[in-house]
Regions:
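Long, contiguous interaction/recruitment modules in multidomain scaffold/adaptor proteins
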Residues: 23-33, 142-204
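Amphipathic alpha-helical scaffolding segments comprising HEAT/armadillo-like alpha-solenoid repeats
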Residues: 97-110, 130-142, 163-173, 191-202, ...
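Short, Lys/Arg-enriched, disordered terminal segments
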Residues: 1-7, 328, 336-346
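N-terminal signal-anchor transmembrane alpha helix of single-pass membrane proteins
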Residues: 1-39
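Structural detector for internal amphipathic alpha-helices that build alpha-solenoid repeat scaffolds
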Residues: 80, 87-97, 119-128, 150-161, ...
Protein backbone atom coordinates (compact mmCIF):
# COMPACT_ATOMS: atom_id res chain seq x y z
CA UNK A 1 0.00 0.00 0.00
CA UNK A 2 2.86 2.36 0.90
CA UNK A 3 4.65 1.61 -2.38
CA UNK A 4 1.50 2.39 -4.36
CA UNK A 5 1.10 5.70 -2.51
CA UNK A 6 4.73 6.64 -3.19
CA UNK A 7 4.35 5.71 -6.87
CA UNK A 8 1.17 7.77 -7.16
CA UNK A 9 2.89 10.74 -5.47
CA UNK A 10 5.86 10.53 -7.85
CA UNK A 11 3.50 10.53 -10.85
CA UNK A 12 1.65 13.57 -9.50
CA UNK A 13 4.91 15.45 -8.91
CA UNK A 14 6.14 14.55 -12.40
CA UNK A 15 2.88 15.73 -13.99
CA UNK A 16 2.95 18.94 -11.98
CA UNK A 17 6.57 19.54 -13.02
CA UNK A 18 5.74 19.02 -16.72
CA UNK A 19 2.70 21.31 -16.53
CA UNK A 20 4.69 23.96 -14.67
CA UNK A 21 7.47 23.76 -17.27
CA UNK A 22 4.92 24.18 -20.09
CA UNK A 23 3.37 27.13 -18.24
CA UNK A 24 6.77 28.78 -17.82
CA UNK A 25 7.57 28.20 -21.49
CA UNK A 26 4.30 29.81 -22.59
CA UNK A 27 4.82 32.79 -20.28
CA UNK A 28 8.37 33.33 -21.53
CA UNK A 29 7.27 32.86 -25.15
CA UNK A 30 4.44 35.34 -24.74
CA UNK A 31 6.74 37.93 -23.18
CA UNK A 32 9.31 37.36 -25.91
CA UNK A 33 6.67 37.71 -28.64
CA UNK A 34 5.31 40.83 -26.98
CA UNK A 35 8.78 42.36 -26.81
CA UNK A 36 9.36 41.46 -30.47
CA UNK A 37 6.09 43.09 -31.58
CA UNK A 38 6.85 46.26 -29.60
CA UNK A 39 10.29 46.40 -31.19
CA UNK A 40 8.81 46.01 -34.67
CA UNK A 41 6.22 48.74 -33.98
CA UNK A 42 8.97 51.08 -32.74
CA UNK A 43 10.93 50.60 -35.95
CA UNK A 44 7.77 51.11 -37.99
CA UNK A 45 7.30 54.54 -36.43
CA UNK A 46 10.89 55.42 -37.31
CA UNK A 47 10.72 54.12 -40.88
CA UNK A 48 7.22 55.34 -41.79
CA UNK A 49 8.00 58.97 -42.83
CA UNK A 50 11.22 57.96 -44.59
CA UNK A 51 9.57 55.16 -46.56
CA UNK A 52 6.60 57.33 -47.47
CA UNK A 53 8.81 60.07 -48.89
CA UNK A 54 10.90 57.51 -50.77
CA UNK A 55 7.85 55.87 -52.36
CA UNK A 56 6.02 59.13 -53.08
CA UNK A 57 8.94 61.17 -54.41
CA UNK A 58 11.85 58.75 -54.91
CA UNK A 59 14.46 61.16 -53.54
CA UNK A 60 14.78 59.91 -49.94
CA UNK A 61 17.70 57.81 -48.71
CA UNK A 62 16.32 54.80 -46.80
CA UNK A 63 18.72 53.37 -44.19
CA UNK A 64 19.44 49.66 -44.61
CA UNK A 65 17.84 47.34 -42.01
CA UNK A 66 20.36 45.45 -39.90
CA UNK A 67 18.24 43.31 -37.56
CA UNK A 68 15.39 40.87 -38.07
CA UNK A 69 12.93 43.27 -36.41
CA UNK A 70 14.05 46.08 -38.71
CA UNK A 71 13.58 43.89 -41.77
CA UNK A 72 10.07 42.87 -40.70
CA UNK A 73 9.10 46.45 -39.80
CA UNK A 74 10.29 47.81 -43.14
CA UNK A 75 8.72 44.97 -45.16
CA UNK A 76 5.33 45.30 -43.46
CA UNK A 77 5.35 49.08 -43.96
CA UNK A 78 6.39 48.77 -47.58
CA UNK A 79 3.71 46.17 -48.22
CA UNK A 80 1.10 48.44 -46.61
CA UNK A 81 2.12 51.47 -48.65
CA UNK A 82 2.07 49.45 -51.88
CA UNK A 83 -1.57 48.53 -51.25
CA UNK A 84 -2.67 52.02 -50.16
CA UNK A 85 -0.67 54.08 -52.68
CA UNK A 86 -1.12 51.71 -55.60
CA UNK A 87 0.36 53.00 -58.84
CA UNK A 88 3.10 51.92 -61.24
CA UNK A 89 5.83 54.26 -60.01
CA UNK A 90 5.36 53.36 -56.35
CA UNK A 91 5.36 49.63 -57.09
CA UNK A 92 8.53 49.99 -59.13
CA UNK A 93 10.34 51.90 -56.35
CA UNK A 94 9.11 49.37 -53.76
CA UNK A 95 10.48 46.46 -55.83
CA UNK A 96 13.81 48.28 -56.25
CA UNK A 97 14.10 48.79 -52.49
CA UNK A 98 13.09 45.19 -51.79
CA UNK A 99 15.69 43.88 -54.25
CA UNK A 100 18.32 45.98 -52.52
CA UNK A 101 17.50 45.23 -48.87
CA UNK A 102 15.27 42.14 -48.48
CA UNK A 103 16.48 39.45 -50.89
CA UNK A 104 19.11 37.90 -48.58
CA UNK A 105 16.78 38.00 -45.57
CA UNK A 106 13.89 36.39 -47.47
CA UNK A 107 16.18 33.78 -48.99
CA UNK A 108 17.13 32.69 -45.46
CA UNK A 109 13.47 32.70 -44.37
CA UNK A 110 12.56 30.29 -47.18
CA UNK A 111 14.66 27.66 -45.41
CA UNK A 112 13.26 28.34 -41.92
CA UNK A 113 12.00 25.31 -39.99
CA UNK A 114 8.70 27.05 -39.14
CA UNK A 115 6.00 26.95 -41.81
CA UNK A 116 4.67 30.39 -40.83
CA UNK A 117 8.03 32.03 -41.51
CA UNK A 118 8.36 30.31 -44.89
CA UNK A 119 4.83 31.30 -45.92
CA UNK A 120 5.37 34.93 -44.87
CA UNK A 121 8.54 34.99 -46.96
CA UNK A 122 6.60 33.69 -49.97
CA UNK A 123 3.89 36.33 -49.52
CA UNK A 124 6.46 39.12 -49.34
CA UNK A 125 8.31 37.80 -52.40
CA UNK A 126 5.03 37.82 -54.33
CA UNK A 127 3.97 41.28 -53.13
CA UNK A 128 7.37 42.83 -53.91
CA UNK A 129 7.62 40.94 -57.22
CA UNK A 130 11.11 39.62 -56.42
CA UNK A 131 11.82 37.66 -59.60
CA UNK A 132 15.49 37.47 -58.61
CA UNK A 133 14.57 34.68 -56.16
CA UNK A 134 13.02 32.49 -58.87
CA UNK A 135 15.79 29.86 -58.67
CA UNK A 136 15.27 29.51 -54.90
CA UNK A 137 11.53 29.14 -55.50
CA UNK A 138 12.16 26.42 -58.09
CA UNK A 139 14.42 24.54 -55.67
CA UNK A 140 11.82 24.89 -52.92
CA UNK A 141 9.07 23.50 -55.18
CA UNK A 142 11.13 20.37 -55.85
CA UNK A 143 11.50 19.54 -52.13
CA UNK A 144 9.73 16.33 -51.12
CA UNK A 145 8.67 17.66 -47.71
CA UNK A 146 6.92 20.68 -49.25
CA UNK A 147 3.45 21.24 -47.79
CA UNK A 148 0.36 21.64 -49.98
CA UNK A 149 -0.04 25.20 -48.72
CA UNK A 150 3.46 26.11 -49.91
CA UNK A 151 2.92 24.36 -53.24
CA UNK A 152 -0.26 26.36 -53.88
CA UNK A 153 1.46 29.64 -53.09
CA UNK A 154 4.46 28.78 -55.25
CA UNK A 155 2.25 27.96 -58.24
CA UNK A 156 0.48 31.31 -57.87
CA UNK A 157 3.87 33.01 -57.87
CA UNK A 158 5.12 31.06 -60.89
CA UNK A 159 2.00 32.21 -62.75
CA UNK A 160 2.55 35.82 -61.68
CA UNK A 161 6.23 35.72 -62.67
CA UNK A 162 5.30 34.09 -66.02
CA UNK A 163 7.50 31.11 -65.30
CA UNK A 164 7.91 28.96 -68.45
CA UNK A 165 7.45 25.69 -66.52
CA UNK A 166 4.18 26.63 -64.82
CA UNK A 167 2.25 24.41 -67.28
CA UNK A 168 4.34 21.35 -66.38
CA UNK A 169 3.98 22.13 -62.67
CA UNK A 170 0.19 22.37 -63.00
CA UNK A 171 0.02 19.00 -64.74
CA UNK A 172 1.76 17.44 -61.73
CA UNK A 173 -0.66 18.73 -59.08
CA UNK A 174 -2.52 16.23 -56.91
CA UNK A 175 -6.16 15.90 -55.83
CA UNK A 176 -5.67 18.24 -52.86
CA UNK A 177 -5.87 21.20 -55.25
CA UNK A 178 -9.38 22.61 -55.55
CA UNK A 179 -11.04 24.57 -58.34
CA UNK A 180 -10.66 27.65 -56.15
CA UNK A 181 -6.89 27.06 -55.95
CA UNK A 182 -6.71 26.87 -59.72
CA UNK A 183 -8.78 30.04 -60.06
CA UNK A 184 -6.26 31.90 -57.91
CA UNK A 185 -3.39 30.60 -60.04
CA UNK A 186 -5.15 31.50 -63.31
CA UNK A 187 -6.03 34.98 -62.04
CA UNK A 188 -2.31 35.81 -61.85
CA UNK A 189 -1.53 34.85 -65.44
CA UNK A 190 -1.08 37.44 -68.16
CA UNK A 191 -3.17 37.24 -71.35
CA UNK A 192 -0.54 35.28 -73.29
CA UNK A 193 -0.17 32.62 -70.60
CA UNK A 194 -3.94 32.37 -70.06
CA UNK A 195 -4.52 31.96 -73.80
CA UNK A 196 -2.03 29.10 -73.89
CA UNK A 197 -4.00 27.41 -71.09
CA UNK A 198 -7.22 27.78 -73.11
CA UNK A 199 -5.57 26.55 -76.32
CA UNK A 200 -4.65 23.29 -74.54
CA UNK A 201 -7.98 23.09 -72.70
CA UNK A 202 -8.59 19.37 -73.17
CA UNK A 203 -5.09 18.47 -71.94
CA UNK A 204 -5.96 19.61 -68.41
CA UNK A 205 -7.76 17.76 -65.65
CA UNK A 206 -11.43 18.54 -65.00
CA UNK A 207 -10.79 20.93 -62.11
CA UNK A 208 -8.47 23.09 -64.19
CA UNK A 209 -10.89 22.99 -67.13
CA UNK A 210 -13.80 24.18 -64.99
CA UNK A 211 -11.63 26.86 -63.37
CA UNK A 212 -10.57 28.09 -66.83
CA UNK A 213 -14.18 28.46 -67.98
CA UNK A 214 -15.14 30.24 -64.76
CA UNK A 215 -12.21 32.68 -64.97
CA UNK A 216 -13.10 33.68 -68.53
CA UNK A 217 -16.35 35.01 -67.11
CA UNK A 218 -15.01 36.38 -63.84
CA UNK A 219 -12.14 38.23 -65.54
CA UNK A 220 -14.32 39.35 -68.48
CA UNK A 221 -11.98 37.85 -71.08
CA UNK A 222 -13.92 38.75 -74.22
CA UNK A 223 -11.19 37.30 -76.45
CA UNK A 224 -12.33 33.82 -75.38
CA UNK A 225 -16.08 34.21 -76.04
CA UNK A 226 -15.77 32.15 -79.23
CA UNK A 227 -14.24 29.33 -77.16
CA UNK A 228 -17.20 29.47 -74.75
CA UNK A 229 -19.60 29.28 -77.68
CA UNK A 230 -17.93 26.11 -78.95
CA UNK A 231 -18.41 24.57 -75.50
CA UNK A 232 -22.15 25.26 -75.75
CA UNK A 233 -22.26 22.50 -78.38
CA UNK A 234 -20.34 19.98 -76.27
CA UNK A 235 -22.09 16.74 -75.35
CA UNK A 236 -20.98 17.03 -71.72
CA UNK A 237 -23.56 19.14 -69.89
CA UNK A 238 -21.13 20.54 -67.30
CA UNK A 239 -19.17 22.31 -70.05
CA UNK A 240 -22.38 23.85 -71.40
CA UNK A 241 -23.53 24.91 -67.93
CA UNK A 242 -20.26 26.61 -67.05
CA UNK A 243 -19.97 28.23 -70.47
CA UNK A 244 -23.45 29.73 -70.04
CA UNK A 245 -22.52 30.94 -66.57
CA UNK A 246 -19.36 32.61 -67.93
CA UNK A 247 -21.33 34.24 -70.78
CA UNK A 248 -23.82 35.53 -68.19
CA UNK A 249 -20.92 37.08 -66.24
CA UNK A 250 -19.82 38.84 -69.43
CA UNK A 251 -23.46 39.60 -70.45
CA UNK A 252 -22.72 38.37 -73.95
CA UNK A 253 -25.89 38.41 -76.11
CA UNK A 254 -26.54 35.01 -77.64
CA UNK A 255 -29.22 34.88 -80.33
CA UNK A 256 -32.68 33.75 -79.28
CA UNK A 257 -32.61 30.46 -81.19
CA UNK A 258 -29.39 29.43 -79.44
CA UNK A 259 -30.74 30.37 -76.02
CA UNK A 260 -34.00 28.46 -76.52
CA UNK A 261 -32.00 25.26 -76.95
CA UNK A 262 -30.55 25.70 -73.46
CA UNK A 263 -33.82 26.91 -71.93
CA UNK A 264 -35.46 23.65 -73.09
CA UNK A 265 -32.60 21.45 -71.87
CA UNK A 266 -33.52 18.35 -69.81
CA UNK A 267 -30.68 19.35 -67.43
CA UNK A 268 -32.11 21.83 -64.93
CA UNK A 269 -28.74 23.48 -64.21
CA UNK A 270 -28.45 24.30 -67.92
CA UNK A 271 -31.92 25.85 -67.93
CA UNK A 272 -30.91 27.84 -64.85
CA UNK A 273 -27.75 29.26 -66.42
CA UNK A 274 -29.58 30.00 -69.65
CA UNK A 275 -32.08 32.03 -67.63
CA UNK A 276 -29.26 33.80 -65.81
CA UNK A 277 -27.94 34.93 -69.18
CA UNK A 278 -31.47 36.01 -70.18
CA UNK A 279 -31.63 38.15 -67.04
CA UNK A 280 -28.44 39.94 -68.11
CA UNK A 281 -29.22 40.55 -71.79
CA UNK A 282 -33.04 41.10 -71.59
CA UNK A 283 -34.13 39.67 -74.95
CA UNK A 284 -37.84 40.40 -75.14
CA UNK A 285 -38.51 37.79 -77.83
CA UNK A 286 -37.79 35.11 -75.19
CA UNK A 287 -40.51 36.30 -72.79
CA UNK A 288 -42.99 33.54 -73.64
CA UNK A 289 -40.35 30.82 -73.20
CA UNK A 290 -39.27 32.33 -69.88
CA UNK A 291 -42.90 32.57 -68.70
CA UNK A 292 -43.23 28.82 -69.19
CA UNK A 293 -40.14 28.27 -67.02
CA UNK A 294 -41.78 30.08 -64.08
CA UNK A 295 -43.74 26.79 -63.90
CA UNK A 296 -40.58 24.66 -63.86
CA UNK A 297 -40.49 21.77 -61.39
CA UNK A 298 -37.18 23.03 -59.92
CA UNK A 299 -37.49 25.92 -57.46
CA UNK A 300 -34.25 27.69 -58.42
CA UNK A 301 -35.21 27.59 -62.12
CA UNK A 302 -38.63 29.12 -61.34
CA UNK A 303 -36.97 31.81 -59.26
CA UNK A 304 -34.40 32.67 -61.94
CA UNK A 305 -37.13 32.78 -64.59
CA UNK A 306 -39.14 35.24 -62.50
CA UNK A 307 -36.04 37.40 -62.00
CA UNK A 308 -35.35 37.35 -65.76
CA UNK A 309 -38.93 38.54 -66.41
CA UNK A 310 -38.62 41.27 -63.77
CA UNK A 311 -35.57 42.65 -65.60
CA UNK A 312 -37.54 43.08 -68.83
CA UNK A 313 -38.68 46.65 -69.68
CA UNK A 314 -42.25 45.89 -68.50
CA UNK A 315 -41.24 43.18 -66.04
CA UNK A 316 -43.61 44.18 -63.24
CA UNK A 317 -46.60 44.01 -65.58
CA UNK A 318 -45.57 40.56 -66.84
CA UNK A 319 -45.23 39.22 -63.30
CA UNK A 320 -48.56 40.75 -62.27
CA UNK A 321 -50.22 38.94 -65.17
CA UNK A 322 -48.67 35.61 -64.10
CA UNK A 323 -49.65 36.19 -60.46
CA UNK A 324 -53.28 36.82 -61.45
CA UNK A 325 -53.89 34.41 -64.32
CA UNK A 326 -51.43 31.49 -64.20
CA UNK A 327 -52.94 28.03 -63.79
CA UNK A 328 -49.85 26.95 -61.82
CA UNK A 329 -49.90 27.69 -58.07
CA UNK A 330 -46.10 27.63 -57.79
CA UNK A 331 -45.77 30.06 -60.71
CA UNK A 332 -48.25 32.45 -59.04
CA UNK A 333 -46.36 32.28 -55.75
CA UNK A 334 -43.02 32.89 -57.45
CA UNK A 335 -44.41 35.83 -59.43
CA UNK A 336 -45.78 37.39 -56.25
CA UNK A 337 -42.43 36.96 -54.48
CA UNK A 338 -40.50 38.71 -57.27
CA UNK A 339 -43.19 41.38 -57.63
CA UNK A 340 -42.61 42.27 -54.00
CA UNK A 341 -38.85 42.42 -54.52
CA UNK A 342 -39.27 44.51 -57.65
CA UNK A 343 -41.55 47.03 -55.95
CA UNK A 344 -39.14 47.36 -53.02
CA UNK A 345 -36.31 48.27 -55.41
CA UNK A 346 -38.42 50.37 -57.77
Amino acid sequence: MLNELVFFTVILIALFTVLFAIFLYLVVRKRKDGKWKREVETYKQLYEPVLFRYLAYGDEQVPAPSSSAQHVAMMELLDHFMRVLANGGIKERATTLAEMYFVDYLRAQLAHRRLGRRMNALFFIEDFYLCSLIHELEAMYEQKQLTTMEKRQLLKMFALFQHPHVYEYMKQTDESFTQFDYRLILSRMDDHMFTKMVDHFFDWNEKIQYALIDMIGIMQKLAHVSFLRTLLRHEQSEYRIRALKALAEIAFPLDSAQLRIHLHSPVWQERLMGLRLCARIRQYELVETIKELVKDRVFSVRSQAAEALLRMPNGLAILEQIAQTSDDRYARDMALEWLERGREND
